[in-house]
Amino acid sequence: LRARFTGKPEYVENLMIFIARELREIMARLGIRSVAELVGRIDLVRQKSQDDNFKLSRVDLKRVLFHPYIDASVGHMHMIDQDHELERTLDMSKLLRMCRPAIEDQKPIRAKLAINNINRVVGTLVGSEVTRRYGESGLPDNTIKLNFEGSAGQSFGAFIPKGMTLELEGDANDYLGKGLSGGTITVYPPKKSIFEADENILIGNVAFYGATSGTAYINGVVGERFAVRNSGITAVVEGLGDHGCEYMTGGEVLVLGKIGRNFAAGMSGGYAYILDCDERYVNTGLVELRPANNDDLKRIKELVE
């Protein structure tokens, strides 16, 4: 990678040193002792005159530079560390302890749990422990297999590595499988539901954003921006919203239904198989549309089965 760039890392280091030095000189002239003291000092900023530039002369920053009255007792910068309440997450309260034998000794773990939409990034902390111990290789397939029932919160299964399998009977919010890194995610409607899965939204927007490896099976329709920047996962879904497979560079996506507008915009790699393809919805700037050949049909059968 470095061969593609000219210069040396030391050049960047020198640049940052010079920026810091110049900043200190400016602060000294203003009588400011630290960067923290600069926070909120709108009185030190003014709009530079650009009368000789037609476009810039029409820019008015008065509202941006307006200095509202703030009582002295109110802090104008970071004062209190944000409490992310990690100890209340499903991973910290249950899953890490439950999956400890798998993480430490690679012993298979099977469990079934209820989930609701306040349970966010479920599986991510467990996955981070797996990656910390075993690196990119992860665990043997299905070492950790967790079945959930309910409505999952945002980022369900985000970044989970190889060896983790999450199965959800229910639905999920946005960012499902974000950054998937080798794991497997399966989502299907409640077994008692009476609606048609291929006609109803089961997953929110931006599912599998930036996913690099793994597999996903969604028995339902997903929202917008599905598999954006996918570079290696294999996903089967029954329909998706606008901007599907945007900037995709690798992997496979099988759509057993309809697609939304602007499909495959900026897609430079990978394969997408679409059952009900309206060519008007496909951005053909970088992709080629063609009927499935025998090899494609064989692969599609493998994915469906």
Q: PLM ranges: what are they?
A:
Residues 34, 55, 60-61:
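Short, solvent-exposed coil/turn linker segments
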Residues 1-33, 39-40, 63-305:
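Long, distal/terminal scaffolding or interaction modules
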Residues 41-57:
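Short glycine/threonine-rich loop-to-helix capping motif typified by GTGT followed
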